[in-house]
Amino acid sequence: MPTKKDYYEILGVPRNATQDEIKQAYRRLVRQYHPDLNKDPSAHEKFKEINEAYEVLSDPQKRAQYDQFGHVGDFSGYGDFQGGWQPGGFDFGDLGRNFEDIFENFFGDSIFGDLFGRRREREKAPRKGADLRYDINITLEEAAFGSEKEIYVTRLETCPTCKGKGTEPGTNPVKCDMCNGTGQIRNMRQTPFGQFVQITTCPKCHGTGQIIINPCHECHGTGKVRRKRRVEFKIPAGVDEGYVIRLAGEGEPGENGGPNGDIYIHIHIIPHKIFKRDNEDIWMELPIDYLIALLGGEVEVPTLEGKEKIYIKPGTQTGEVITLKGKGIPYLRNKNQRGDQKIVVKITVPQNLSPKEKELLLEIAKLRGINIEKDKNIFEQIKKAFKGDN
């Protein structure tokens, strides 16, 4: 039968109360009327009303139904099976629902529970904690040679005050009076297939068999608190963009004795000002003076490990590639093997010449049979000569 009780009035909260306000009111009334704490004969009935109101108002779906219709239907959608098959509001569209949900609506965690995996037991089974993801930017040098890093992780941990019990120090949970500490509610159900025992998780203690009367002031009864921790880890030599490092057991704590989750570090490499990476090789452009290109000589080039001198052979052309063996990125799977550094030569021609330099270059041009057109800039012609244009 639909209830005529005003659940909001029972809990002493307004109709627009938040879930936190409803929970606080419930806990206050539980401490006041719990039969183990209040010996008044009327306390037991009042306590049942409080639990009934909280069961509805703490569930958003049930609360919405209560607010709309003034009651919460029992076994909605299948009619009332007391006394035989009553189709009532049966919606044939519901036939497409998952069979597990249909049978649990009929039988709860009854004999059919084993056929569908025993949902209640699955809920109590150890579960791994949630994994966490962090993204970190590193330099090309750190990617090449590896590095040690640290991050600060905010995660749930066991409450240090109550040691995970959820109760205020010096107090203990009390046995749930709704399920008598079993964590289960057993009801007889008359169905089209006969009479069955319906076993469901206790809505009051959520299957724990215990009720926290005095919640811990630090974790508010959850047994867990958020803490910021420093986590150190190593980046191996040779990693590339998108590489993922797994830190086992550093994620959120597990439930029901399950293992902690993991942290996954996603590596991103900051673009380098000089080098471009190509797998294990690195590439760079090296501007050199045109005289070095003509006559040859030593120049200083940057490498991942510092500056190094190399020799430019006479007559080197723009676009030539000089290879420094073993100066690239170490192979991730073989630290003793490295890629190469590829240097692309880019010859630079001066924009301004002194009169003496111009005179000498004109002499060289004559020796090489180059006709310097007087109406064209000598520097443009020199550039053309280096490019091979005539």
Curated annotation (Swiss-Prot):
Residues 6-70 form the J domain. Binds 2 Zn(2+) ions per monomer. It is found in: Cytoplasm. Keywords: Chaperone, Cytoplasm, DNA replication, Metal-binding, Repeat, Stress response, Zinc, Zinc-finger. CXXCXGXG motif repeats lie at residues 159-166, 176-183, 202-209, 216-223. Zn(2+) 2 binds at C176, C179, C202, C205. Zn(2+) 1 binds at C159, C162, C216, C219. InterPro entries: DnaJ, DnaJ_C, DnaJ_domain, DnaJ_domain_CS, HSP40/DnaJ_pept-bd, HSP_DnaJ_Cys-rich_dom, HSP_DnaJ_Cys-rich_dom_sf, J_dom_sf. One of its GO terms (biological process) is response to heat. SUPFAM superfamilies: Chaperone J-domain, DnaJ/Hsp40 cysteine-rich domain, HSP40/DnaJ peptide-binding domain. It holds the Pfam family DnaJ. Transmembrane segments: none annotated. A zinc finger (CR-type) spans 146-228. PANTHER family: CHAPERONE PROTEIN DNAJ, DNAJ HOMOLOG 1, MITOCHONDRIAL-RELATED. Belongs to the DnaJ family. Homodimer. The J domain is necessary and sufficient to stimulate DnaK ATPase activity. Zinc center 1 plays an important role in the autonomous, DnaK-independent chaperone activity of DnaJ. Zinc center 2 is essential for interaction with DnaK and for DnaJ activity. HAMAP family: DnaJ. Participates actively in the response to hyperosmotic and heat shock by preventing the aggregation of stress-denatured proteins and by disaggregating proteins, also in an autonomous, DnaK-independent fashion. Unfolded proteins bind initially to DnaJ; upon interaction with the DnaJ-bound protein, DnaK hydrolyzes its bound ATP, resulting in the formation of a stable complex. GrpE releases ADP from DnaK; ATP binding to DnaK triggers the release of the substrate protein, thus completing the reaction cycle. This is Chaperone protein DnaJ.
